[in-house]
């Protein structure tokens, strides 16, 4: 009898240890992406009316996120909830910038991204080191940011929105599609685009087709690529298809086999998405992602074309807050000065 009691005590102890381990794992995972405003409660009706927009605010280019937010908020009557994502050491500065500027009226939540989630998943070598910044991979983890919403918009920080964001949010996603992107071959004014020397618009520019792992995918290198700087995502499908896990798998494969970090496109975050979403995404109206404004400081779009655009994206090295850059006047019209005086424009006349 005493032996049986002792065995039961041991089994009970092991059960408690196991439960504690599971609980710790869940809590630890939850800290990778932590929402400062998780205590805020919202009714189902309020959540239905909200348009969640995720945008990252990196330390060295926080003014970009603020300009993007200003342009979105100023051009719509919709109820926008901004999820502003940053690293721990920038969260107080993000809040100060919003609350001590014209942006104080926006509805927002500040979210901390813990880069520990990326440990062992990123190769250190890249033709563009800035693309290795942790916040560049936030788009992979949208379901850990958005818990209440079925649909979400993700935007890169180097964009300006000139249309009503409600139109972008209303983008139709086909059954079984977790996201919508802009096809690189569907850009308007393609004759202007082709003058941008070195621009990549096919999978060949992002994947290394010399590697067997890439060849085995069976994807033609001439397949049109897409740009993940503007995403309309369905969170239910994203979770159902385990998109985040798939993306992490292709990050890990790149660490082991160097599948795309040396590609012409330099698309460290783009390449895994091209693989995971191949043939399984919906498309965004081309006017809602006019891009490559940061590709070449000597190439300009026509003013009429830019006025028609709903969203402008300065992807590339030449950002509108730096010099040299093009069409920076359009970006500056939405710039919100930094209350702390840290972020400054680098233009000859600024």
UniProtKB/Swiss-Prot annotation:
Q: List the disulfide bonds.
A: none
Membrane topology value: Single-pass type II membrane protein
Membrane side Cytoplasmic: which residues?
A: 1-6
**What are the record keywords, sorted?**
Glycoprotein, Glycosyltransferase, Membrane, Signal-anchor, Transferase, Transmembrane, Transmembrane helix
Its annotated compartments are: Membrane
Q: Which family does it belong to?
A: Belongs to the glycosyltransferase 8 family.
Instruction: Please report the name of this protein according to its UniProt entry.
Output: Glycosyltransferase 8 domain-containing protein 2
Give the gene symbol. Answer: GLT8D2
